Amino acid sequence: MKTRSRCSTLLLTLALASTLGAASVHAQESAPCPTGPVSMYQPNHTLTSPVQMSFTQFNKKTVTIYYSAPSKFCRKIFGTLVPFGEVWRTGANPSTTIVSEVPLKIGTLDVPAGTHTLYTLPSAPGKPWLLIVNNETGQWGTVYHQEQDLGRTPMTASTLPTSQERMSITWEKKGTELHIRWDNLDESVPVSAQ
């Protein structure tokens, strides 16, 4: 009889624990944004910026962008986390890199085939952002040397209908526009092969 009672107690405990665990997971998924400071080291909070790749082709030649995509995670992004008027790595972790098998025209810039680093210079609403193509490669994203700039070109801004949680870099209009989207902003620049 004691064995049956212990088994019943164990089964009841497991059922209760799984019910509470499911409720706990649901509560974590639907919890509102915290109102105070958030620690990166809180259990069950993954603030990673996964490595992403975006590519297009011109005349069967590939152009690939490698970047790390940060998440908003209830933070104010532009003007705070990403300050206006300061060069931004345009992602997270290592520098955002463009590798092209063909010479490109990016906005007003003539970019030779090869590997380059992309930065942006965010501006307050109403002023154009600048896309920066830099010749230095392989560095961490916060390392920037202006003397290595190939050049800067203005971008076109538009507002997204809903906030985008994770930053993305995509090719649109059959690969002829490069878009950087995050939060409620969509910054774009035309790209063509030379």
Regions found by a protein language model. Name each.
Residues 2, 21-26:
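N-terminal targeting/docking segments
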Residues 2-12:
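Bacterial N-terminal signal peptides that target proteins for export
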Residues 11-21:
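Bacterial N-terminal signal peptides
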Residues 13, 71, 81, 91, ...:
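Preference for short coil/turn "hinge" residues that link or interrupt alpha-helices
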Residues 26-86, 123, 136-194:
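Primarily secretory-pathway and cell-envelope proteins
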Residues 86-138:
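Mid-length scaffold segments of soluble, non-membrane domains
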